[in-house]
């Protein structure tokens, strides 16, 4: 049985709490436990890159991690992955800060990681690479003679040609991506955007619906929307409330709660969301004193100016809205710039009447799925969801909105707050059915199954050699 090798920018620690944060870690650990194998990635620490890999083995899984130098971390991670690729892939070219040394550092670190992984690989390993930090990784492995099956999963959106092709190094990135055997995307729109970018640059031959050749390299493209653990989330949400939360729930028994949580990021549409809530207060005054909107947005990348700017903007907007509409005994908007335990958030989801998830652009958005999974099926809340979140392709029974249209979002909030129990139950049941069928294990099993079906490049070349060899004529 082939071993699975997973490569990601960061690895979850090899302990019993590794998957407690949910998301990617749960899926990866599930795949590794099924096949046995290796999880390879950055340790999260800076230091001497020449030090031996730190290896930990538990059961049939080995964790191998490495340090990065301060310069490599800054150029590869901060300056290129997060200051070029992240804003560009989220359609924010105005925030891209391209610097040639950062591009060189990005390529250098991908080459370094390939050098470190190479001695650990076995001939029949199946290799699964994750996310935008490692776009050139298969190319570096191929340069080193690796013919194993290599798959790639992009967790963020893939932009259309007019966005992607504005990157100074777009052509190199596209050609290097074709060194993967299988390219996975969150949505069909992302998959088609990649193929459009490729077709604008070179001739792409499509052998079947999702099998292609470019620059003489054969690869497949497919859609793999990442899922969650709905049963585990429901279990966490239904457990007893901590004393403080129980007291708050009692105090707010006559107040309808609108709730949002995500890390502080310009892609999440938080300023637009605040303005939409203000439009709700302005156009639907019957809700005054009867609703409360709580926004949790812990700081991420706090040293980056764009993130500092949005934090200050939100603080100012929250103060302005509360000053304009607040009353004695009623604060309409609570903005909390701090981290909360994930299990506690699931309980808060369960007692929120509306889940408000309106990113301007998002690969999937697992918060939307978690909100649905956390609800009481007999008395569920309503999900208001951006059309630009990947989850909108699956959760079609949510109230789908354009986050740039504050009046539309306000109208959806009013509808959610006044929706009948029967309609809430019906919409929730339809979404929960999708989430249960397409859970995190289904996601990883589909990807691994498709990757296993691909013929390794070494076998492909042998087949071509046989076809091209003719007996010598007498």
UniProtKB/Swiss-Prot annotation:
Which of this chain's residues are annotated to bind UDP-alpha-D-glucose?
22-23, 263, 268, 340, 366-370
Question: Which terms in the Gene Ontology molecular function aspect does this entry carry?
Answer: alpha,alpha-trehalose-phosphate synthase (UDP-forming) activity
Q: Where does D-glucose 6-phosphate bind?
A: 10, 77, 131, 301
The biological process GO terms on file are: trehalose biosynthetic process
Disulfide-bond pairs as recorded: none
Per the record, the pathway is: Glycan biosynthesis; trehalose biosynthesis
The family database entries (Pfam families) matched by this protein are listed as: Glyco_transf_20 (PF00982)
Task: List, alphabetically, the InterPro entries matched.
Answer: Glyco_trans_20, Trehalose_OtsA
Signal peptide residue numbers? none
Site label Involved in alpha anomer selectivity, positions = 86, 156
Catalytically driven reaction(s): D-glucose 6-phosphate + UDP-alpha-D-glucose = alpha,alpha-trehalose 6-phosphate + UDP + H(+)
Q: What is its EC number?
A: 2.4.1.15
Describe the function of this protein.
Probably involved in the osmoprotection via the biosynthesis of trehalose. Catalyzes the transfer of glucose from UDP-alpha-D-glucose (UDP-Glc) to D-glucose 6-phosphate (Glc-6-P) to form trehalose-6-phosphate. Acts with retention of the anomeric configuration of the UDP-sugar donor.
Q: Which family does it belong to?
A: Belongs to the glycosyltransferase 20 family.
Query: What protein does this entry describe?
Result: Trehalose-6-phosphate synthase
């Amino acid at each position: 049985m082939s071993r699975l090798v997973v490569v990601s920018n960061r690895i979850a620690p090899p302990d019993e709490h590794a998957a407690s944060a949910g998301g990617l870690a749960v899926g990866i650990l599930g795949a590794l436990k099924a096949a046995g194998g290796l999880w390879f990635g950055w340790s999260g620490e800076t230091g001497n890159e020449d030090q031996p890999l730190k290896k930990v083995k538990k059961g049939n899984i080995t964790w191998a991690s490495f340090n990065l130098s301060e310069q490599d971390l800054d150029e590869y991670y901060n300056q290129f992955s997060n200051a070029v690729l992240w804003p560009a892939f989220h359609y924010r070219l105005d925030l891209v800060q391209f610097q040639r040394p950062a591009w060189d550092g990005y390529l250098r670190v991908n080459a370094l990681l390939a050098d470190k992984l190479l001695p650990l690989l076995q001939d029949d390993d199946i290799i699964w690479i994750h996310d935008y930090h490692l776009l050139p990784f298969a190319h570096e492995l191929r340069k080193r003679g690796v013919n194993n099956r290599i798959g790639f999963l992009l967790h963020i959106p893939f932009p259309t040609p007019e966005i992607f092709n504005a990157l100074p190094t777009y052509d190199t990135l596209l050609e290097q991506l074709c060194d993967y055997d299988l390219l996975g995307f969150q949505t069909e729109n992302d998959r088609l955007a990649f193929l459009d970018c490729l077709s604008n640059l070179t001739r792409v031959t499509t052998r079947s619906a999702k099998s292609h050749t470019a620059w003489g390299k054969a690869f497949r493209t497919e859609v793999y929307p990442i899922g969650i653990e709905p049963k585990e989330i429901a279990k966490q949400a239904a457990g007893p409330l901590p004393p403080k939360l129980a007291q708050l729930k009692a105090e707010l028994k006559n107040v309808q709660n609108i709730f949002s949580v995500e890390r502080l990021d310009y892609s999440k549409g938080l300023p637009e969301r605040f303005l939409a809530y203000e439009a709700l207060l302005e156009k639907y005054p019957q809700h005054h004193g009867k609703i409360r909107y709580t926004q949790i947005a812990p700081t991420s990348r706090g040293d980056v100016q764009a993130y500092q700017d949005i934090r200050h903007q939100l603080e100012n907007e929250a103060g302005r809205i509360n000053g304009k509409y607040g009353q004695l005994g009623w604060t309409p908007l609570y903005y909390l710039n701090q981290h909360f335990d994930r299990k506690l958030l699931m309980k808060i989801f369960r007692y929120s009447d509306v889940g408000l998830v309106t990113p301007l652009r998002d690969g999937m958005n697992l918060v939307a799925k978690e909100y649905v999974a956390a609800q009481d099926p007999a008395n569920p809340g309503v999900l208001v969801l951006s059309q630009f979140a990947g989850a909108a392709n699956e959760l079609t029974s949510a109230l789908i909105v354009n986050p740039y249209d504050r009046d539309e979002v306000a109208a959806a909030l009013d509808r959610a707050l006044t929706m009948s129990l029967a309609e809430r139950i019906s919409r929730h049941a339809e979404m929960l059915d999708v989430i249960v069928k397409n859970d995190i294990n289904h996601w990883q099993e589909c990807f691994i199954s498709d990757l296993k079906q691909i013929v390794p490049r070494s076998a492909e070349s042998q087949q071509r050699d046989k076809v091209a060899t003719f007996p010598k004529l007498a």
